[in-house]
């Protein structure tokens, strides 16, 4: 069995080196090209999908659409879920990473970005960019909508969707594409690969590059590689 992850192509805020999180930004020109190249590469290597899962953020949805279009599979059903959203970066969202490091120190920013269990400063629920004010999340209980997350909380958010939707799809024989975000994919990778809390800090997933997992019947990883 195989599973393909793809992190969305470069976003406009990736290009500007800003913290993004749940803020909804578009793909950059480079990001659009990365997604198209990924779709073509998947087609060239014979990858076909029966279902695709993505987040409710534009950059991941757009990447999913482009990948499927470029691989002549735009007909493949897509399921969009908030559970595959990027990690919520709280008050850091929209800030310049370099300037934030100058203000708080490189080590503090590294911990905020890569630590498994350290939360960023939380965003106020009344902030104009709070997810509580976004109709994408209006159906969710207020205590479920995050104001800031670490990777541990992100995994706790993503894991129920893996167990309820993604894993059963793979086990039923479906060929699955997951188009999501750096940290939601890191969280899934941690679970699938059994990566330790310490080692997950060093895992980077590049934008726009298909990551293939070959899995056994228990969804244990047999092989992992980028196309």
UniProtKB/Swiss-Prot annotation:
GO biological process, one term: glycolytic process
Site (Transition state stabilizer): 181
Active site: 8, 86
GO function terms (MF aspect): phosphoglycerate mutase activity
Residues the entry annotates as binding substrate: 7-14, 20-21, 59, 86-89, 97, 113-114, 182-183
CDD domains: HP_PGM_like
Swiss-Prot/TrEMBL keywords: Gluconeogenesis, Glycolysis, Isomerase
EC id: 5.4.2.11
Pathway connected to this protein: Carbohydrate degradation; glycolysis; pyruvate from D-glyceraldehyde 3-phosphate: step 3/5
UniProt superkingdom: Bacteria
Pfam families in UniProt: His_Phos_1 (PF00300)
Catalytic activity as recorded in UniProt: (2R)-2-phosphoglycerate = (2R)-3-phosphoglycerate
Chain coiled-coil ranges: none
Signal peptide: none
SMART domains noted in UniProt: PGAM
Assembly and interaction partners: Homodimer.
Function in brief: Catalyzes the interconversion of 2-phosphoglycerate and 3-phosphoglycerate.
Protein name, UniProt field: 2,3-bisphosphoglycerate-dependent phosphoglycerate mutase
Organism in which the protein naturally occurs: Neisseria meningitidis serogroup C / serotype 2a (strain ATCC 700532 / DSM 15464 / FAM18)
């Amino acid at each position: 069995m195989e599973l393909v992850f793809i992190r969305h192509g470069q976003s406009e805020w990736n290009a500007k080196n800003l913290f993004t999180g749940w803020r909804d930004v578009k793909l950059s020109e480079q990001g659009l090209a990365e997604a198209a190249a990924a779709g073509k590469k998947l087609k060239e290597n014979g990858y076909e999908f029966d279902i695709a899962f993505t987040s409710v953020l534009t950059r991941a949805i757009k990447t999913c659409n482009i990948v499927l279009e470029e691989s002549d599979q735009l007909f493949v059903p897509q399921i969009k879920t908030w559970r595959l959203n990027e990690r919520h970066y709280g008050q850091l969202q929209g800030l310049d990473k370099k300037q934030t490091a100058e203000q708080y120190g490189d080590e503090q920013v590294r911990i905020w970005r890569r630590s498994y269990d350290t939360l960023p400063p939380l965003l106020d629920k009344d902030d104009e960019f709070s997810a509580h004010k976004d109709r994408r999340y209006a159906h969710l209980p207020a205590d479920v909508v995050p104001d800031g997350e670490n990777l541990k909380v992100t995994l706790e958010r993503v894991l129920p969707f893996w167990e309820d939707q993604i894993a059963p799809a793979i086990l039923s024989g479906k060929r699955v594409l997951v188009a999501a975000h750096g940290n939601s994919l890191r969280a899934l990778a941690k679970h699938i690969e059994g990566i330790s809390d310490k080692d997950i800090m060093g895992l980077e997933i590049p934008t726009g590059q298909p990551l293939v997992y070959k899995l056994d019947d228990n969804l244990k990883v047999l092989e992992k590689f980028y196309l």
